[in-house]
């Protein structure tokens, strides 16, 4: 007996006599459920107020931020109005060139006003964050709350210590000129696979077009979209045969596995996917190397270098460049403390930050030789006094007095 559905189609008509239609549907990629009404979520005055206060954290020294906070409710109303009637027009960014000490490169920042552009960017991310995080790879890190370099450091250190056979080989890759090379049209189409709110997508399109070619370094929204754009690449590489451990810190990709040939295949697949699907390219300085050397073989093993550390089988050390910078800072502070010259807040904070990295690697001898002779309590006292001074100045800015402490 042939069972008939309410539509009038039988089981044979629906699936085919040999089940070919069912197989076809199973193999076809299913469109993910898309989210709508995100623009309407932005039209919430409580959310706008929260975003303004969050965006102003650690920026009270800026005149434009103090102006917005002094008339908070007025700016909440104005933000709501320009979004509700669609009168918001993205501001053309100002260009600023800085020298990035960590990467030893000159970078071009694009800066927009705190209001309205900075607030609108943050509002977009706030309502879009659950959508972007939904399919993100667990070890896709950088510029995401709770996903910094420490997450990758723990993962790689554990892998190198506990699985020497599965980490015999490593592959390191870097995307060439990542931010300025992202094609905006492809990015918007990729976002459209998860978001169906056309008004919301038009707003993102207008912001991205205003920043010129590619994504802008300095836009809060761009760092989220950059991670989202590489989501497909992350899952493709993480699932490839021979790739046992996979991490990505913004545009720096690290893969570990037991077989060198399989890692080369993953590298070639990544280059093809980036070129054909994402419109990007891999730098020529990619590396595939062995992290362990057999006892009878000549040569030394190489360490995996990522997020400021070098990961060996069984222990972790600081990168040479980071170690030398910490050493120079330590000698300057030692000299000042011996001569009785006060250490500046910037020097104290910078040294304590770099010295804190030693707590996350094997550094007993380094601490004994370079850190023990420095009076750490004095440096913490300098930072504490500056923090109290800034706190009192912040209360005085609004004509109030700080609460009494016990």
Where are these regions (language model features)?
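Beta-rich nucleic-acid/ligand-interaction surfaces
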Residues: 142-152, 254-256, 287-297
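Conserved pre-motif C helix in the palm subdomain of viral-like polymerases
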Residues: 106-137, 212-239
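Conserved polymerase palm-domain catalytic core
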Residues: 154-250, 254-269, 289-290, 303
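Reverse-transcriptase-like RNA-dependent polymerase core
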Residues: 82-105, 119, 196-210
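Right-hand nucleic-acid polymerase module
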Residues: 3-5, 11-14, 19-22, 118, ...
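Active-site-proximal segment of RNA-dependent polymerases
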Residues: 25-38, 125-183
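Non-catalytic, polymerase-adjacent accessory regions of viral genome-replication enzymes
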Residues: 1-77, 81, 398, 402-406
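A common structural junction motif
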Residues: 195, 271-280
């Amino acid at each position: 007996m042939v069972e008939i559905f309410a539509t009038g189609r039988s089981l044979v008509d629906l699936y085919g006599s040999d089940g070919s239609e069912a197989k076809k549907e199973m193999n076809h990629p299913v469109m993910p459920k898309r989210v709508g009404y995100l623009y309407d979520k932005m039209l919430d005055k409580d959310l706008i107020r929260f975003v303004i206060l969050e965006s102003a954290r650690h920026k009270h020294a800026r005149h434009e931020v103090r102006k917005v906070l002094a008339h908070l409710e007025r700016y909440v109303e104005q933000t709501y109005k320009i979004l509700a009637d669609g009168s918001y027009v993205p501001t053309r960014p100002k260009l600023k060139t800085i020298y990035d000490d960590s990467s030893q490169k000159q970078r071009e920042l694009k800066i927009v006003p705190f209001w309205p552009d900075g607030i609108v960017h943050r509002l977009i991310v706030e309502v879009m964050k659950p959508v972007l995080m939904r399919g993100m790879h667990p070890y896709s890190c950088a510029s995401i709350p709770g996903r910094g370099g420490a997450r990758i450091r723990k993962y790689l250190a554990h892998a190198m210590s506990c699985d020497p056979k599965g980490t015999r080989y490593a592959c390191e890759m870097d995307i060439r000129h990542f931010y300025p090379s992202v094609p905006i049209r492809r990015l918007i189409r990729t976002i459209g696979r998860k978001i169906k709110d056309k008004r919301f997508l038009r707003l993102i399109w207008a912001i991205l077009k205003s920043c010129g070619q590619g994504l802008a370094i300095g836009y809060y929204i761009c760092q989220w979209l950059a991670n989202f754009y590489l989501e497909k690449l992350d899952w493709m590489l993480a699932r490839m045969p021979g790739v046992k451990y996979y991490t990505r810190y913004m545009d720096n990709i690290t893969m570990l596995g037991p077989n060198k040939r399989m890692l080369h295949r993953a590298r070639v697949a990544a280059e093809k996917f980036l070129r054909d699907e994402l419109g990007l390219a891999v730098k020529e300085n990619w590396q595939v190397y062995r992290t362990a050397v057999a006892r009878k073989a000549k040569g030394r093993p190489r360490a995996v270098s990522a997020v400021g550390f070098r990961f060996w089988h069984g222990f972790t050390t600081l990168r040479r460049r980071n170690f030398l910078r910490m050493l120079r800072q330590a000698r300057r502070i030692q000299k000042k403390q011996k001569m009785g010259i006060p250490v500046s807040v910037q020097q104290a904070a910078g040294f304590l930050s770099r010295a804190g990295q030693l707590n996350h690697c094997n550094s007993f001898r380094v601490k004994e030789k370079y850190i023990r002779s420095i009076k750490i309590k004095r440096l913490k006292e300098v930072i504490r006094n500056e923090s109290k001074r800034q706190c009192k100045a912040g209360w005085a800015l609004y004509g109030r007095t700080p609460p009494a402490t016990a």
